[in-house]
Amino acid sequence: MNSGIDLQASFIESLNQLGIPSGAAKALWIPFPSFLMIIGATVGVLVVVWLERKISAAAQQRIGPEYAGPLGVLQPVADGIKLVFKEDVIPAKADPWLFTLGPVLVVLPVFVSYLIVPFGQNLVITDLNVGIFFWIALSSIAPIGLLMAGYASNNKYSLLGGLRAAAQSISYEIPLALSVLAIVMMSNSLSTIDIVEQQSGYGILGWNIWRQPVGFFIFWIAALAECERLPFDLPEAEEEIVAGYQTEYAGMKFALFYLGSYVNLVLSALVFAILYLGGWEFPVPLDKLAEWLGVSEDSSWLQVITASLGITMTVLKAYFLVFIAVLMRWTVPRVRIDQLLDLGWKFLLPVSLVNLLLTAALKLAFPVAFGG
């Protein structure tokens, strides 16, 4: 694996230099990733919610949030405070333990997945050598929480929503994993940092989107389905099943579903940017940038600037994808459940298998271009 800026190792080493033993330093590190994940993901969600409401308003020729802060930027905060103080109701015949555990199982894996996301030039909380596999494994836990929430609510609409969520997740998780496997095959690594490093050196031409155009579309469609974004929001289709598995929820439990949905959208966009859009890499190669600026490629200030701007590049790519997902909400109709399942099993699955086999063949035929 590449020697990047591993926050865990750097944090422990810094405390050791201050005279703190390694055991105590590791104990101090334990709550630190959780703090970073919660703060970063929550801020990201607040931005996405505000963007979605403003974009939705523009699509419908409305103003949108306006009074809570400048341009209504504090409206998501106001909504969050409102949900915190709303009454937490548990239906009389619901299973209270499963009813409470469902939202937790939906949110927790998504937050933990941020551990392996490199936000900048090798800037990652924990650089796992199986990082991308870790993300796929965690993403398979959330549907269990959705099914649990639907079953525990003792409501027919909630149960239908939970069953739809489970069926949808199973149908699209396999094509998504196969499209990621093609990237892993080219990168010869499951580390998210190694995957980005494999795309470096050639600017925009080195990004995996050009070598994996089919996988690019498979991943995008499957990610939208996993996030339950239109046109794949069947588990909570208001016109058909009220609010799906969320029907009986209120207060903070409802807020957890709401939070998990948007955190998952931002996470999927970040992973998408890492796999296909070069992560923190610039569209222009670093040597060309140094040549245009008339400085050495090894210049310390150039390295600092590019490392700092790398974080901005990762976030900009992710939010561009979020913008497209939000825009799709007002441009495409919702599909039927049979169309949803047919698309996953009869089209995306075989195409993703063919794409994987084709990638293996190209890797053998053109090892330089496809990571042989």
UniProtKB/Swiss-Prot annotation:
Keywords recorded for this protein, A-Z: Membrane, NAD, NADP, Plastoquinone, Quinone, Thylakoid, Translocase, Transmembrane, Transmembrane helix
Gene this chain is encoded by: ndhA
Annotated EC: 7.1.1.-
GO cellular component: plasma membrane-derived thylakoid membrane
Enzyme class (EC, first level): translocase
GO molecular function: NADH dehydrogenase activity; oxidoreductase activity, acting on NAD(P)H, quinone or similar compound as acceptor; quinone binding
Name this protein carries in UniProt: NAD(P)H-quinone oxidoreductase subunit 1
GO biological process: aerobic respiration; photosynthesis, light reaction
UniProt source species: Crocosphaera subtropica (strain ATCC 51142 / BH68) (Cyanothece sp. (strain ATCC 51142))
Family: Belongs to the complex I subunit 1 family.
Function in brief: NDH-1 shuttles electrons from an unknown electron donor, via FMN and iron-sulfur (Fe-S) centers, to quinones in the respiratory and/or the photosynthetic chain. The immediate electron acceptor for the enzyme in this species is believed to be plastoquinone. Couples the redox reaction to proton translocation, and thus conserves the redox energy in a proton gradient.
PANTHER family: NADH DEHYDROGENASE SUBUNIT 1, NADH-UBIQUINONE OXIDOREDUCTASE CHAIN 1
Subunit structure: NDH-1 is composed of at least 11 different subunits.
